[in-house]
Curated annotation (Swiss-Prot):
Keyword Transcription in record: yes
Single GO term (MF): DNA binding
Residues annotated as signal peptide: none
Keyword presence, Repressor: yes
The name this protein goes by in its record: Heat-inducible transcription repressor HrcA
Lineage: Bacteria, Pseudomonadati, Pseudomonadota, Alphaproteobacteria, Hyphomicrobiales
PANTHER family tied to this protein: HEAT-INDUCIBLE TRANSCRIPTION REPRESSOR HRCA
InterPro entries, A to Z: GAF-like_dom_sf, HrcA, HrcA_C, WH-like_DNA-bd_sf, WH_DNA-bd_sf, WHTH_transcript_rep_HrcA_IDD
UniProt record similarity statement: Belongs to the HrcA family.
GO biological process, one term: negative regulation of DNA-templated transcription
One Pfam family per UniProt: HrcA
Keyword tags: Repressor, Stress response, Transcription, Transcription regulation
Physiological role: Negative regulator of class I heat shock genes (grpE-dnaK-dnaJ and groELS operons). Prevents heat-shock induction of these operons.
Length: 362
């Protein structure tokens, strides 16, 4: 069963803990009706759904109490009620039963990733994981991966101009990264070759982060072996790998079109337009997903609990994934309307993250 952590953004309310079974049952029916249809539900329908028979008038009294607690509200167009963000958070943390995936759902995620993982790069496998997750959950799926965790295979310096060279980094999974490097004046071809040999002897099988540490130590110990120009090239090559913050993080989004399904009104269309705008603000999305790297298990952000998606009224369900050494190297998950099927989506995100971790550990 998937584990998820309440994020503690909403102050505990003593009244919530004191809800009796009848109030919880009515509240659960309001939320489940909303998650299924997106429409407000009235007291007459609720009285037909609950386990213990109650008149619509009695249901209305309970709904009034729930409204005072801030768990539900009445939209201006309807006599029915909808859950608030606080209500959804209370439902997810206290009332919802998170189930296990069906065997076909597990197989769908696992088999697709297994076939890609054998033949292609990690990036291709992550994209396939997103496509599969997006299709199963009918949401936009996202992954944030740290490039510094890619394992290196080879480095080469290619002279472009007298004072410029291309640094070509080849990873074990086939990814190629190019950086332009400014050379010290008067660098002979032999210095570029010597720098390449020095680096290649020490980087194979290491991540960028590991390689930087190893090479900084090795460079300090090997200065007597290398002439000054070669030392400068090696040092410049190491520095070029650091890049900017955005270079060290890669954001992939799949399944935008799923967000256009099941729109109920013009305000739904406006909400999705705002969400598309939010997804374009790459830096903020990266910052949000980065928060999950410090979490144990699935994280859930509902509506305004997360500033980025507050205007579009969206929910985010994300989980970290690890490499073979157990180090967290990225985050994957889904973004969609607050009307997500949380009980179904949470275990899917959790399972996809675990399968990606297994794949990276092979």
């Amino acid at each position: 069963m998937a584990h998820h952590d309440p994020i503690g953004l909403i102050a505990p309310n003593a009244g919530l803990a004191q809800l009796n079974e009848r109030s919880r049952d009515i509240f659960r029916q309001i939320v489940e009706s909303y998650l299924a249809t997106g429409e407000p539900v009235g007291s007459r329908n609720i009285s037909r759904l609950i386990a213990v028979p109650l008149s619509p008038a009695s249901v209305r009294n309970v709904m009034s109490d729930l409204e005072q607690l801030g768990l539900i509200y009445a939209p201006h167009t309807s006599a029915g009620r909808l859950p608030t963000e606080l209500g959804l958070r209370f439902f997810v943390d206290a009332l919802m039963q998170v189930g296990d995936l069906t065997e076909p759902e597990r197989q769908s995620i696992q088999s697709q990733l297994a076939s890609v993982g054998k033949a292609q790069s990690v990036e291709a496998a992550l994209e396939e994981a997103l496509t599969r997750l997006s299709g199963l959950t009918r949401t936009a799926a996202v992954v944030l991966t740290a490039k510094s965790n890619v394992r290196l295979k080879h480095i080469e310096f290619v002279r472009l101009e007298p004072d410029k060279a291309l640094v070509v980094l080849v990873a074990e999974d086939g990814q190629v990264e190019n950086r332009v490097l400014t050379l010290p004046s008067g660098v002979p071809a032999s210095a570029l070759t010597e720098a390449s040999n020095f680096l290649n002897a020490r980087i194979r099988g290491r991540t960028l982060a590991e390689a930087r540490l190893e090479l900084e130590t090795a460079l300090a110990q090997s200065k007597a072996e290398l002439d000054q120009l070669t030392q400068k090239i090696v040092a410049a090559g190491i520095a070029s790998w650091s890049g900017g913050d955005s270079d060290d993080r890669q954001l992939i989004v799949r399944g935008h079109a799923n967000l256009l399904e099941d729109l109920h009104a013009m305000e739904d269309l406006e909400r999705v337009r705002l969400l598309f705008d939010d997804l374009e603000t790459k830096r903020e999305v990266i910052d949000l997903l980065g928060r999950a790297e410090r979490a144990d298990g699935v994280r859930i952000f509902i509506g305004s609990e997360n500033k980025l998606f507050s205007l579009s009224g969206s929910s985010t369900i994300i989980a970290p994934y690890s490499d073979g050494a157990g180090h967290i190297v990225g985050v994957l998950g889904v973004i969609g309307p607050t009307r997500l099927n949380y009980a179904r989506v949470i275990p899917m995100v959790d399972y996809a993250a675990r399968i990606v971790s297994q794949m990276l550990g092979r």
